[in-house]
């Protein structure tokens, strides 16, 4: 279940148009509605544990980068679990960086260029994952950079 706010009048009209045709984009099912209610009424402990876990993963990633790959800097997110990796110090052009991360490191990160001008040489990484995935990423990134020397 999710919530949507559409400030743009034209986009809201388009959304409402499609909604009328029964695409069920605005209607939750009984399981989803019950789960959402339970989460709002009884989910505070789980939510706080999740926030703690995400913070621990961010801190792990930051420390591991500083220790193993200091030329890559973590930019802590302001409100999400998807921080930005500042990879400018690697000296790669944006397309080369994307292919390096995707093909040589083997990580499906979001290229910063996807998000507009200024995103060159930056990548987004999702830390809402198991710690072992972040450990594997650090290991593969360090090895791929070492192989390029």
What is the predicted role of each segment?
Residues 1-149:
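PLP-dependent class I/II
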């Amino acid at each position: 279940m999710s919530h949507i706010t559409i400030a743009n009048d034209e986009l809201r009209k388009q959304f409402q148009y499609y909604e009328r045709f029964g695409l069920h984009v605005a209607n939750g099912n009984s399981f989803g509605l019950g789960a959402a209610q339970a989460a709002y009424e009884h989910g505070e402990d789980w939510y706080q544990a999740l926030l703690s876990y995400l913070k621990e993963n961010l801190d792990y990633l930051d420390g591991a980068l500083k220790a193993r790959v200091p030329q890559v800097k973590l930019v802590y997110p302001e409100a999400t679990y998807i921080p930005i990796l500042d990879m400018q110090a690697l000296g790669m052009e944006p397309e080369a960086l994307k292919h390096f991360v995707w093909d040589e490191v083997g990580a499906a990160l979001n290229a910063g260029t996807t998000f507009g001008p200024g995103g060159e040489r930056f990548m987004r990484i999702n830390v809402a994952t198991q710690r072992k995935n972040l450990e594997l990423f650090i290991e593969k990134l360090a090895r791929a950079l070492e192989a390029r020397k």
